[in-house]
């Protein structure tokens, strides 16, 4: 099992640098940051841009893989974004993982104009991923679609990783699952939505795990339909009602249950002092000490 961690882009670099270096030193396999202009309950708090943050993190680390959790077409155009991706892969020495999602409702969805309908959002995401794939696998791309155009778009010399950086496609719905099966080197999910207000936390937690097993089966079906096998499966444990780093026991249980469902990777969040992802640094440090045993957990084999 590989263990990753999200560091929200809220801190000035003087502090953030120490955290990115710490997670590499502790032995995490990958580290991520969100790709938003502002995010949910933190919209009025400090929030920095994704690409320069990842470039800075790449410059002060050596081994750990780095990625977007996740980039979306809410405010990204594939042509300039592909150039950024190519640059990040170069600066990191081929350590970039490109997490991609359709983009949900909220601040980012309407910051540049009217938000798309759910159907439009799915259509746009499909074209976004298709165009990114083309841009990152060939030196010159031309495309004229419903949402995007590219005319002689150059991506030279291309990515360090070949044929391109790995796509980790976040997906829950049928169309996104099909897209992940078609283009992804990895599938990512936060798991199913559960109504935490209507039930006890422990009950909601079990409901989440049951729904996750259903999602896993649906992705298996999407893979079969696409005629591909997506090796890597990433689970954000913090899609569940119980915060992954509420205790070391909670993290251990999450890793073991994720492995039993065939996930190869889990992702947690650096604890915040209050609000979303609230937790204690001592638990993160205990988790860091326990990483070798957690990473020794083997994902269940898939047929």
Regions found by a protein language model. Name each.
Residues 1-303:
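Active-site-adjacent structural elements that line small-molecule/cofactor binding pockets in enzymes
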């Amino acid at each position: 099992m590989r263990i990753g961690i999200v560091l929200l882009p809220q801190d000035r670099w003087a502090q953030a640098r120490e955290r990115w270096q710490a997670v590499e030193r502790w032995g995490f396999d990958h580290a991520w940051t969100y790709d938003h202009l502002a995010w949910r309950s933190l919209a009025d708090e400090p929030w920095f841009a994704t690409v320069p943050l990842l470039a800075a993190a790449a410059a002060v680390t050596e081994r750990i893989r780095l990625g977007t959790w996740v980039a979306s077409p809410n405010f990204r155009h594939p042509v300039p974004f592909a150039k950024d991706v190519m640059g990040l892969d170069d600066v990191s020495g081929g350590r970039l993982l490109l997490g991609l999602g359709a983009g949900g409702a909220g601040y980012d969805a309407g910051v540049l104009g009217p938000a798309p309908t759910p159907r439009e959002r799915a259509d746009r995401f499909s074209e976004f991923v298709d165009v990114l794939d083309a841009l990152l696998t060939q030196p010159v791309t031309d495309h004229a679609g419903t949402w995007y155009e590219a005319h002689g778009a150059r991506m030279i010399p291309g990515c360090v990783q070949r044929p391109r950086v790995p796509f980790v496609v976040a997906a829950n719905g049928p169309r996104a699952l099909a897209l992940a099966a078609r283009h992804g080197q990895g599938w990512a999910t936060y798991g199913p939505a559960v109504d935490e207000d209507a039930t006890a936390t422990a009950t909601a937690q079990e409901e989440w795990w049951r729904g996750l097993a259903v999602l896993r089966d649906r992705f298996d079906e999407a893979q079969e339909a696409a005629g591909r096998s997506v090796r890597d499966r990433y689970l954000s444990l913090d899609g569940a009602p119980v915060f992954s780093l509420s205790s070391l026991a909670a993290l251990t249980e999450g890793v073991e249950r994720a492995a039993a469902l065939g996930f190869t990777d889990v992702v947690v969040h650096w604890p915040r002092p209050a609000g979303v992802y609230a937790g204690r640094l001592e638990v993160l440090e205990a988790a860091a000490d326990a990483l070798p045993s957690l990473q020794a957990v083997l994902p269940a084999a898939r047929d």
